[in-house]
């Protein structure tokens, strides 16, 4: 009976599982407090608008975890737990955020860029076509890769 109760409980959780609307992707390393104030501010603004948000700065301690472990957790969240990716200001210059954007694209997720108001009190979500983005970190040359094209 105990086994059946646990099984039914897991099945109920599976049926009622709701994905996050957005995963927040943006620069963290080499920022004071790992850029947590920006991540927190944007996640708060989006939650007020009724969105469900996966904010990586709220999951685990980035100060005590390796880059590889952080990326494993974050990419898993993008693949499994989120419908779209919201790219924060400065994401283009972040290796981690570029990987997150690429994985989101490879998995067919939609993307938006977060544009902050001048005073930082509000943000706008601008649709962003990841298929038009050229992959960085190849010196002078960039490469274009679209896994969804034949």
Indicate residue ranges for each PLM-predicted region:
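Conserved catalytic or regulatory cores that recognize and/or transform ribose-phosphate-containing ligands
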Residues: 2-150
């Amino acid at each position: 009976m105990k086994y059946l109760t646990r099984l039914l409980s897991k099945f109920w959780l599976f049926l009622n599982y709701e994905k996050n609307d957005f995963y927040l992707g943006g620069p963290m390393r080499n920022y004071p407090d790992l850029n947590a104030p920006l991540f927190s501010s944007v996640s708060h603004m989006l939650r007020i608008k009724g969105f469900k948000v996966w904010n990586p700065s709220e999951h685990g301690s980035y100060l005590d975890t390796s880059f590889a472990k952080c990326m494993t957790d974050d990419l898993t969240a993008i693949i499994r737990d989120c419908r779209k990716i919201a790219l924060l200001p400065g994401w283009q210059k972040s290796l981690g955020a570029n990987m997150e954007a690429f994985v989101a694209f490879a998995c067919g997720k939609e993307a938006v860029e977060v544009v902050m108001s001048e005073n930082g009190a509000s943000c706008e979500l601008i649709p962003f076509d990841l298929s038009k983005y050229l992959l960085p970190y190849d010196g002078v040359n960039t490469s274009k890769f679209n896994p969804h094209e034949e």
